[in-house]
Amino acid sequence: MNDLAKVDFSNGPMVYVGEEISYSEIVTYWKGKSMREAFVDQEVKGEQLQKLLRKKYELIQKHLQALVGERELFNFMKQFKQSHLFMRPDFEELEREFNTRFHVNLREILDYYYEGKELPALFIRDLKVELYEEDEETKNIGSCKIYNPTSVPAVVTLSVATYSMGDNEIGSGLRNYLIPGHSCKEIRADLG
C-alpha cells in the first residue's frame, strides 16, 4: 500500500506536541513571519514548530473548504486516494486534478500560506441570532457583517448544524467563510 493511502486527510497530519503553546503565542509568532522562515528558525523547538505548522495546516484546510465546501473537499481527497492506491502520485498530479475539478489554483493558495507574512484583521458588526419557524420546524439563524481591511484573505469559522456527507460520514458542524482582503461580507447560517 502506498503512503498516500495511509494518510487520514480528515484529521490533518499527526502532530506530537510537547510544550504547550497558547493561541496568542501562535498568532504572535506568525505575525510578520512566513512558513518559509519558520522552517529555518533556530529559536523554535521541534515540538513547537509542529504545533505552529498544524495551525497553518488547519487554516489552509479551512480556506479550501470555504472555496469548495467541506463535503466536496472530503469527497475529492477520498476519490483521489482511492484512484491512486498502490501508486506514488506526485503533488503536481494532485494539483492538476484539484484545479480541474474545482477551477481553483491550489498552488497559488499554498504559495500564499508558505510565503505570506501578513495576518488578517477583522471587524464584526450586527452580530445576531434570530429564531426562524416554518412548518413546525424551528431554526436559529445567525448573521453578522464582517469587514477585512487588510490585503490578505481571512477565514471565519462558525459552528453550525451538522449534516451527513454520505458513507456514514458526518460534517464537522463547522462552516468556513472566506473574507477576501479589503472586502466586507454578510454571513447567514443555520446554527441548528
Task: Mark where each language-model region is.
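Extracellular ectodomain segments of secreted/surface proteins
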Residues: K117-K139
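Acidic/His/Gly-enriched intrinsically disordered linker/tail segments
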Residues: M1-H63, L67, H84-L85
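Amphipathic alpha-helical substructures
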Residues: Q42-I124
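Short, flexible coil/linker elements and helix-boundary hinge sites characteristic
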Residues: K6, N99, H103, G181-H182
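Beta-strand-rich binding/interaction modules
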Residues: E133-G192
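Generic recognition of flexible, low-complexity loop/linker segments
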Residues: Q48-L49, R96, L127-E133, S143-N148
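Short, charged/polar low-complexity linear motifs in solvent-exposed/disordered segments
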Residues: F91-E93, R125-V129, G171-L174
